[in-house]
From Swiss-Prot:
Belongs to the ArgJ family. It holds the Pfam family ArgJ. Heterotetramer of two alpha and two beta chains. It is found in: Cytoplasm. Keywords: Acyltransferase, Amino-acid biosynthesis, Arginine biosynthesis, Autocatalytic cleavage, Cytoplasm, Multifunctional enzyme, Transferase. Its EC number is 2.3.1.35, 2.3.1.1. This is Arginine biosynthesis bifunctional protein ArgJ. GO terms for biological process: L-arginine biosynthetic process; ornithine biosynthetic process. The record marks 109-110 as: Involved in the stabilization of negative charge on the oxyanion by the formation of the oxyanion hole. It is an enzyme of class 2 (transferase). It catalyses: N(2)-acetyl-L-ornithine + L-glutamate = N-acetyl-L-glutamate + L-ornithine; L-glutamate + acetyl-CoA = N-acetyl-L-glutamate + CoA + H(+). One of its GO terms (molecular function) is glutamate N-acetyltransferase activity. It comes from Thermus thermophilus (strain ATCC 27634 / DSM 579 / HB8). Its main location: cytoplasm.
Length: 381
């Protein structure tokens, strides 16, 4: 079923010839009204020109009207030309939409170190037809993903729709993929930015597929106010629900993955320590490999936990896998075959109780398979 964007938003895409596959690869997301926006970008020191330009626009505090995305070319590590090409992409999109370039955010994803084919973008932008539906945009921004990622929620009459891409080179560092959330709620920019930081910390920053943080990743929230005011607490609960659903979709669609891993840590000294511990477990290559092999090797969970920096006493920790207690201050008797069968599910939950306080947090990951190696051996990054 088609997902309708919030009031005042339109989107569309085309095949510009950037992806060798010939699939859709150039997309626009547009607000008919100036929108307040909140933005989180990769902290990778080799960040792409689109990220540097986005940070400058964000610092200006001016409203945003549109996003132009190319998928297939990261426009990263392309020297001064890359910065000029990124500016040109914004100018071309602004010309197409009748806006100023300062109202247009750029985003690029794909192969690093290859000049951006601006001439293809120039030819492709006029071909994009804008509609009030999300699917064309969601499809066009994909690279090694196997499926589009769209989530939605409604809060007191206002709508929130999220679109994301991400499959590999996913690891927490401020933002971990391309994610675009749009809403017709009216939210003051200062409140929007503060709330978005908290949402990103709890959702997108808790996803890890392979431990690599991309050079191009961002998470964006636009609010154009077309519906009007809504209760802020309920609004951000809705935003977090959409972001969490997208984060889970990204982890489940990890390159070569066969299952989603959800790690829940409770009883931590602080919420931050709980999130850190959960991320460490979700990102452990040894545990991810055991997950793929349906091996309930709790020692790998404990080892990852010990490297997380979270405070705990190994003699008090409790580890539960798919509802089966494996460890509680020492070895517990359990049926390994039963635990292995439970790990064959499409979603596997690890629950860890540190018994240090009230802090709780989640992280999302996936298993590590031969297909991950194959995909990344064949795909130029």
């Amino acid at each position: 079923m088609a997902v309708r964007l919030p009031r005042g938003f339109r989107a569309g895409a085309t095949r510009a010839g950037i992806k060798p596959s010939g699939r859709p690869d150039l997309a626009l997301l547009v607000s008919g009204l100036p929108a307040a926006w909140a933005y989180a970008a990769t902290q990778n020191r080799a960040a792409a020109p689109s990220i540097h330009r986005g940070r400058a626009l964000y610092a200006s505090g001016k409203p945003l009207r549109a996003v132009v995305v190319n998928a297939g070319n990261a426009n990263c590590a392309t020297g001064e030309r890359g910065y000029e090409d990124d500016r040109r992409m914004a100018e071309l999109a602004a010309l197409r939409l009748g806006l100023s370039p300062e109202e247009v955010l750029t985003a690029s994803t794909g192969v690093i170190g290859v000049p951006l084919p601006v001439e293809k973008i120039a030819r492709g932008l006029p071909e994009i037809g804008l509609t009030p539906f999300a699917e064309a945009f969601a499809e066009a921004i994909l690279t090694t993903d196997t499926r589009p990622k769209v989530a939605e929620a409604e809060v007191a009459g206002a709508r929130i729709v999220g679109l994301a891409k991400g499959s590999g080179m996913i690891h927490p560092n401020m933002a971990t993929m391309l994610a675009f959330l749009v809403t017709d709620a009216l939210v003051p920019q200062e409140a929007l930015r503060a709330g978005w930081r908290r949402v990103v910390e709890r959702t997108f920053n808790q996803v890890t597929v392979d431990g690599d943080t991309s050079t191009n990743d961002l998470a964006l929230l636009m609010a154009n106010g077309a519906y009007g005011e809504v209760p802020l607490k309920a609004f951000f609960e809705g935003v977090e629900a959409v972001a969490q659903e997208l984060a889970r979709m990204i982890a489940r669609d990890g390159e070569g993955a066969t299952k989603l891993m959800v790690v829940r840590v409770v009883g931590a000294a602080t919420e931050e320590e709980a999130r850190r511990a959960a991320r460490a477990i979700a990102g452990s290559a040894l545990w991810k490999s055991a997950l793929y092999g349906n091996d309930p090797n709790w020692g790998r969970i404990l080892a990852a936990l010990g490297n997380s920096g979270a405070r705990f006493d190994p003699l008090r920790v409790r580890i539960v896998l798919q509802g089966i207690p494996l460890y509680e201050g020492g070895v517990l008797p359990f049926d390994r075959e039963e635990a292995g069968r439970a790990m064959r599910a499409e979603e596997v939950e690890v629950l860890v109780d540190l018994r240090e306080g009230q802090g709780a947090g989640e992280a999302y990951g996936c298993d590590l398979t031969e297909d991950y190696v194959r995909i990344n051996a064949l795909y130029t990054t």
